[in-house]
């Protein structure tokens, strides 16, 4: 009986591990898994001048192989995935870790925040480029099957992409269950096509020798660094391994990489290389020309599904990043809609969705081909990778306390490779790479303005503020009329009297029997346990101070959290509790702290941001807002 039970539990564990691995393949590896569609095509037809001959093909294959091994296998799987913030990954989670690591060094902490914002800004640019270049590259395969259909590539791609964005608000819970099996099928097909190609020209297996990569740099010194700008296309999506860690955990992501994804990618790239050795003209689209003629149309269909799944993963990643950034105070509050009753992580943010859709449509119309878009792709990818390395450097040295003699050589290796890839893409800024730079610059400006504006706003509100003990003392001297019920005043400063409370006293000249000064604290960790959710302090005379702590992945539901507050005499009965909010109207001035044009920008962002009412899930019929004007 016991033995049978243990076998059953072991079988259930194995089944769960396998299902997690398949799910990880469907979500995490869509982007990097569709890179074979365009990487070698861009290398040999992207204007780099790489000769399609024996040494050129083997040199490029060796560069791709060892880039995958160093950047993805070594850097991300072995190191970056260990830099989790209580299980969560991604740019914002890593920025929160780096902030914690550099807390004793204010200037270094500011630098880490800037690097985090740059990385996040470039990720949004990547979130527009990935759907455009992936779907275009898949649909372009139809041009090989049908003559004269090339002019339909852009319209068909637009239909697919617009449909993808239109269904976002309905969620992908049901169809999402198919993502894993479809992507597993995709990788099996990649591997099979690769084996088919290699069998016709096993000579390509020599590229496992890194000497061919070194030889390429020696023979083509002027082209060596520049070609890395195309080779990096094989690494697009590496950041997703870290960004999606919170959904699956480090082990399933690592196992999926080594067991399926890496072998399939290497086999396919080498198979394409084998075809190029046999027929240099195949450089116009080596991926599709690797397939037998009868398999071309089914392959186009499968590739289109794979690229849609890759695009979905990036879009979902943008939603998740936005929620984290909102909680950490880097982005104005937006309405977050949950699309699944079971999965808390499945969310929809309309403003992000429509912004991404407009960007993707403009990219497809403006660039018209995956090859033209490739230049823009590399800048966003390498910039994000470089920022991740800088952030993890602070974590390794200051938080993990790794010995410098061990950490510094590894970090120098990471920074050197990332720096070379980024430098190779800098010249592409004038060839189309300006898009992610401009998009990232605009987003960085918005996020930094919002963060700085909120800091100044709190400082201005605090100026001349009345300390809470002084206010309570005055109440004891001249007691106002008290009414039944609980008044909750939201305030950023728990030690000062909120403006809403002062205005309420001034205009209504009454106080509730219980007055709660509530401060919501956003933590640099993803989730806060319920037992650590609140701090309560009683001041006497019916005054209480409550601090509610939320992580950047928590839902800041204030009424639900207040139900957990247990203190004698403190009553949060819904129909006896009224929430008082301050609604600030910002006026840009010439006061120190922020230039006037940025002050106007912050005022615009504040005016259009979601208020505390919706963000904290406050009951609409129990909220009173009191306005105030603030100069910044």
Curated annotation (Swiss-Prot):
Short name of one Pfam family: K_trans
Organism in which the protein naturally occurs: Pseudomonas putida (strain W619)
UniProt cross-references to InterPro entries, sorted A to Z: K+_transporter (IPR003855), K_trans_C (IPR053952), K_trans_N (IPR053951), Kup (IPR023051)
Gene that encodes it: kup
Similarity remark: Belongs to the HAK/KUP transporter (TC 2.A.72) family.
Protein origin, superkingdom: Bacteria
Chemical reaction(s) catalysed: K(+)(in) + H(+)(in) = K(+)(out) + H(+)(out)
Cell location: Cell inner membrane
Swiss-Prot/TrEMBL keywords: Cell inner membrane, Cell membrane, Ion transport, Membrane, Potassium, Potassium transport, Symport, Transmembrane, Transmembrane helix, Transport
Function comment: Transport of potassium into the cell. Likely operates as a K(+):H(+) symporter.
Residues that span the membrane, as ranges: 20-40, 60-80, 111-131, 146-166, 178-198, 216-236, 257-277, 289-309, 347-367, 379-399, 404-424, 429-449
Any one GO molecular function term: potassium ion transmembrane transporter activity
Keyword Membrane: yes
GO terms for cellular component: plasma membrane
Membrane-topology annotation of the record: Multi-pass membrane protein
Name used for this protein in its record: Probable potassium transport system protein Kup
UniProt keyword Ligase present: no
